[in-house]
Swiss-Prot record:
NCBIfam families: purC (TIGR00081). GO terms for biological process: 'de novo' IMP biosynthetic process; cobalamin biosynthetic process. Pfam families: SAICAR_synt. PANTHER family: MULTIFUNCTIONAL PROTEIN ADE2, SI:DKEY-6E2.2. This is Phosphoribosylaminoimidazole-succinocarboxamide synthase. It comes from Nostoc punctiforme (strain ATCC 29133 / PCC 73102). Pathway: Purine metabolism; IMP biosynthesis via de novo pathway; 5-amino-1-(5-phospho-D-ribosyl)imidazole-4-carboxamide from 5-amino-1-(5-phospho-D-ribosyl)imidazole-4-carboxylate: step 1/2. The keyword Nucleotide-binding applies. CDD domains: SAICAR_synt_PurC (cd01415). It comes from the Bacteria. Transmembrane segments: none annotated. The gene is purC.
Length: 245
């Protein structure tokens, strides 16, 4: 399969068209951003690590019955994906209070939620990716009520699977972001990536509130050892996959 032209460049990936209109090539970058790209940097090897982690998790989710855009990973930092029209929504699933949830509600960091919280954010950097109510979501016509219900159901299914998987890795899944898209048949697919860039991950065996962090919060908060943390997550994922298979 040949790669044609650049279709889109985002913060973490570049998308290219291929000779198949139904297939795109995603090239994962080492670039790192935080706070809606107000903070920028680079994490050495991040592209390869995130592509590898995402590929493994997409395969596991497909086997679990979740339809994703994943096709194959021809190189360590590249992924062949089904072409989808991304819904302009960031779907955040929270199991433990952290980040903006604590800032906006006053909940102490680390509070275990009685049930997973599913939130929708408007995928719009110019507006700062604001939290949406369902009524606002419908007002902006970002998705239909049927799509929102389907996404919520899928998000909870994905959370149930990933919670168990990360536990096998000795990692606590605090919260994470998902994106969904529609293929040419209007089928809803899980898209984007699942990685330390999009998940808040804590080392289950580490009690120190800083040392336990294994995700992009290390970059956001200048905690150091970002590359080592990402690499450790990858190694644990590969070990868990090997054990599962």
């Amino acid at each position: 399969m040949s790669v044609n032209s650049k279709l889109y460049e985002g913060k973490a990936k570049i998308l290219y068209t291929t000779d198949d209109p139904e297939v795109l090539l995603a090239d994962f970058k080492d670039d790192a951003t935080a706070f809606n790209a107000q903070k920028r940097g680079s994490i050495q090897g991040k592209g390869k690590i995130n592509c590898s982690i995402s590929s493994q998790l997409f395969k596991q989710l497909e086997a679990y019955g979740i339809k994703t855009h994943f096709i194959d990973s021809p190189t360590p930092n590249q992924m062949l994906v089904k072409a989808v029209k991304i819904l302009p929504l960031e779907v955040v699933i929270r199991n433990i209070a952290a980040g903006s949830l604590c800032q906006q509600t006053g909940l102490p960091v680390g509070t275990i939620l009685k049930q997973p919280l599913v939130e929708f954010y408007y995928k719009n950097d110019h507006l700062g990716d604001p939290l949406l109510t369902r009524d606002r979501l419908y007002l902006l016509e970002l998705a239909t009520a049927e799509q929102v219900d389907a996404i919520t159901h899928l998000a909870l299914q994905i959370n149930e699977f990933l919670n168990k998987f990360w536990q096998q890795c000795g990692i606590t899944l605090v919260d994470f972001k998902l994106e969904f898209g529609l293929d040419s048949q209007q089928q809803l697919l899980l898209a984007d990536e699942i990685s330390p860039d999009t998940c808040r991950l804590w080392d289950t065996t580490e009690e120190d509130s800083n040392r336990r962090i294994m995700d992009k919060d290390r970059f956001r908060r200048d905690l150091g050892n970002v590359e080592d943390a990402y690499q450790e997550v990858l190694q644990r994922v590969l070990k868990a996959v090997e054990t599962t298979n």
